[in-house]
Curated annotation (Swiss-Prot):
Assembly, per entry: Heterotrimer of A, B and C subunits.
Catalytic residue positions: K80, S155, S179
Catalytic reaction list: L-glutamyl-tRNA(Gln) + L-glutamine + ATP + H2O = L-glutaminyl-tRNA(Gln) + L-glutamate + ADP + phosphate + H(+)
Molecular functions per Gene Ontology: ATP binding; glutaminyl-tRNA synthase (glutamine-hydrolyzing) activity
InterPro entries: Amidase, Amidase_CS, Amidase_dom, AS_sf, GatA
Function (record text): Allows the formation of correctly charged Gln-tRNA(Gln) through the transamidation of misacylated Glu-tRNA(Gln) in organisms which lack glutaminyl-tRNA synthetase. The reaction takes place in the presence of glutamine and ATP through an activated gamma-phospho-Glu-tRNA(Gln).
EC id: 6.3.5.7
GO biological process: translation
Alphabetic keyword roster: ATP-binding, Ligase, Nucleotide-binding, Protein biosynthesis
One Gene Ontology term, aspect cellular component: glutamyl-tRNA(Gln) amidotransferase complex
Protein name (Swiss-Prot/TrEMBL): Glutamyl-tRNA(Gln) amidotransferase subunit A
Species the sequence originates in: Endomicrobium trichonymphae
UniProt family annotation: Belongs to the amidase family. GatA subfamily.
Length: 485
């Protein structure tokens, strides 16, 4: 593997701007690595090699001539295939959108273009982001780079696998119930989901609108904070996006005293779930490392954690059924040629183009929103969601961050299932609209990486990056170790 690919993004930016490294060298190294590893991993659905090399040459010319450059000029990135880039296909890994061309840029893409980033390709995902393994993509299954017989997690598994294997220095994903942070844990990298409303979702294909957020994959916490600084900007086109000053999350991320001043909450409910033995052991080691550095740990009690899987299924599926209702095959997307009338055409367009997991969620969502079930299912779920939010808010009176394993299981082989409780502490962040970040902490005896998760209070993202960065420094995890593919 080319050593240039092990360079952290901040250092890449400085070396490109100073002329020590050319952007075209980095982009060529990325595509060389992709050609060597992606036939096994299958992280990318589409590559833009010719255009990327042309853009890299243009970036180098800008720097050489002293022209105005973006702050991330010439740095390559992977983009999950549910985020629009004007003039490019966006499939959401579904047959329904296989010929769809994005008519405009997503808000995050606009900001990255201003920063001078180079989009090397589209990463694989579960179809319409519905799944936790990247197996429901209609095009290919993505493998975990550390063992290609195992899943990388999902739904943003392609982005996670691409960063983990060194194909790109960072990537964008989306997170509805852990879809960035779970695969980050499985693949041994950093995965960050922002506070609800911090990053605009304009131009991202909606799954469940009260959960969805766009976030970041990277090898280090500092790289994640750097990218977030460019995309976390107020946007009136997303009605829940906060408007405010742009924040440099990378500035001041190094806080040598933070562990001596914070209280870390450990959920009492952890003991209620059967986590993999090694996860329990290594999580305990991580807690002890925090204590040794001066962090205070307190037990917090959030009884409503037990409702998280059911809450997520009911509310998420209800929102899925509403969002997918706009996919009629008439205005855009797959259109059946077998319809006898308009209603039949709607039905057949979906039946012929949507996968099993998507259909299952639409059906369940339609059921819980039905007149007979709305109050006892959907309405009750929203009430319990409020209960969960209130209990977590109360927990933050005793602590500054909630700390847990990223997942309660290690990755499974293709075709095997994760338990419904596996992502419970990740999904809670989506239900409550809170920021969360997964940081790798160790390798297990099987050679697979394991991650831990910090969850902060609403809009505590800057401090969340600080605590995650502090843990990264004491974890002992070798960020320069890459899978041998």
């Amino acid at each position: 593997m080319d050593e240039i690919l092990k360079t952290r993004v901040k250092d890449l930016c400085e070396k490109i701007r100073s002329g020590q490294i050319k952007s075209i060298e980095i982009v060529k190294a990325c595509f060389k690595r992709i050609k060597e590893t992606d036939p096994k991993v299958k992280a990318f659905l589409k590559l833009n090699e010719e255009r990327s090399l042309k853009q890299a040459a243009q970036s180098d010319d800008k720097i050489k001539t002293g022209a105005e450059c973006g702050s991330l000029e010439g740095v390559p990135i992977g983009i999950k295939d549910n985020i629009m880039i004007k003039g490019e296909s966006m499939t959401s890994a579904s047959k329904y959108l296989e010929n769809y061309i994005s008519p405009y840029d997503a808000a995050v893409i606009e900001k990255l273009k201003e920063a001078g980033v180079i989009f090397v390709g589209r990463t694989n995902m579960d179809e319409f982001a519905m799944g936790g393994s990247t197996e429901t993509s209609v095009y290919q299954k993505t493998a975990n780079p550390w063992n290609i017989d195992y899943i990388p997690g999902g739904s943003s598994g392609g982005s996670a696998a691409a960063v983990s294997s060194g194909m790109v220095p960072f990537a964008l994903g989306s997170d509805t119930g852990g879809s960035i942070r779970q695969p980050a844990g499985f693949c041994g990298i950093v995965g960050y989901k922002p506070s609800y409303g911090l990053i605009s979702r304009y131009g991202a294909c909606a799954l469940a609108s009260s959960f969805d957020q766009i976030g970041v994959f990277s090898k280090t916490v500092k790289d994640a904070s750097l990218l977030t600084s460019f995309i976390a900007v107020g946007d009136y086109r997303d009605p829940v996006c906060e408007t405010g000053e742009q924040t440099n999350y990378a500035h001041g991320i190094y806080n040598p005293d933070i562990l001596k001043t914070v209280r870390i909450g450990i959920p009492k409910q952890l003991s209620n779930y059967k986590a993999d033995e090694e996860i329990t052991k290594y999580f305990g080691d991580a807690v002890n490392k925090l204590k040794l550095e001066g962090a205070a740990t307190v037990e917090i009690d959030v009884p409503a954690y037990k409702y998280v899987p059911a809450l997520y299924e009911v509310i998420m599926c209800a929102e899925v059924s509403a969002n997918i209702a706009t996919f009629d095959g008439i205005r855009y997307g797959y259109r059946s040629s077998n319809g006898r009338n308009l209603n039949d055409e709607y039905a057949k367009s979906r039946a012929e183009s949507l996968g099993y997991e998507v259909k299952k969620r639409i059906l369940f969502g339609t059921y819980v929103l039905g007149a007979k079930n709305y109050y006892r299912c959907y309405h009750q779920a929203q009430r319990v969601r409020t209960l969960l939010i209130n209990q977590i808010t109360d927990a933050y009176k005793k602590c500054d961050f909630i700390f847990s394993p990223a997942t309660l299981q290690m990755p499974v082989k293709f075709g095997e299932k994760l338990s419904e409780e596996c992502d419970i502490f990740l999904t809670a962040a989506n239900l409550a609209g809170l920021p969360g970040i997964t940081v790798p902490c160790t390798f297990t005896s099987s050679g697979m990486p394991m991650g831990v998760h910090f969850m902060g209070s609403r809009f505590s993202d800057a401090k969340l990056f600080q605590i995650a960065d502090a843990f990264e420094r004491i974890s002992g995890f070798d960020i320069n170790k890459y899978p041998n593919l």
